[in-house]
Amino acid sequence: MAGLKQHSGLVVPLDAANVDTDAIIPKQFLQAITRVGFGKHLFHEWRYLDAEETRLNPDFVLNFPQYQGATILLTRKNLGCGSSREHAPWALADYGFKVMIAPSFADIFYNNSLNNHMLPIRLSEEEVEEIFQWVWANEGKQIHIDLEAMTVTVGDKIYRFELDEFRRHCLLNGLDNIGLTLQHEDAITAYESKIPAFLR
């Protein structure tokens, strides 16, 4: 898994608070247990005009032509509230999002996003409002995230964010739980060679 050190991308300004996991990926799409294929169902109720997903809703921001290919999601407070389904970050990642910016995130959703190699950035409500205004006024322009410096550059303004050092290390180095374990493969092998066979 590639590390996420810096990222520049288009921003989708989803001007809504309390976007819950059922809005992100409705329950009827949760049967699969692999992480791929959920992106087409992302924001199903808002994004499509029909249950079969054949008609896009032209009034939903994700469908606006100027935001196609966006990799950064900007929302209001409490993103990812509701049920703890890990399919929500799966759907966002499968669609192509790498970074989310909001004043706050639901705790489980926040951790699930980090576990799925997405960066949830918390900024103040005032800072998020400034970014909304900039995105609306600067159609087609990208913003830049630097995880090493822990900054978000929007036009000529720099915002600073915080992230737990362990989580930052994992994102920078592309490490998931398996990758972290494999960093200790030699020690694990040495331990296993010393224990009785019936305990292996």
UniProtKB/Swiss-Prot annotation:
Which chain regions cross the lipid bilayer? none
Q: In which pathway does it act?
A: Amino-acid biosynthesis; L-leucine biosynthesis; L-leucine from 3-methyl-2-oxobutanoate: step 2/4
Q: Which GO terms describe its cellular component?
A: 3-isopropylmalate dehydratase complex
Q: Which GO terms describe its molecular function?
A: 3-isopropylmalate dehydratase activity
**GO BP annotations, alphabetical order:** L-leucine biosynthetic process
Q: What SUPFAM superfamilies does UniProt report for this protein, alphabetically?
A: LeuD/IlvD-like
Summarize the subunit comment.
Heterodimer of LeuC and LeuD.
Indicate what this protein is called per its UniProt record.
3-isopropylmalate dehydratase small subunit
What lineage is on file? Bacteria, Pseudomonadati, Pseudomonadota, Gammaproteobacteria, Pasteurellales
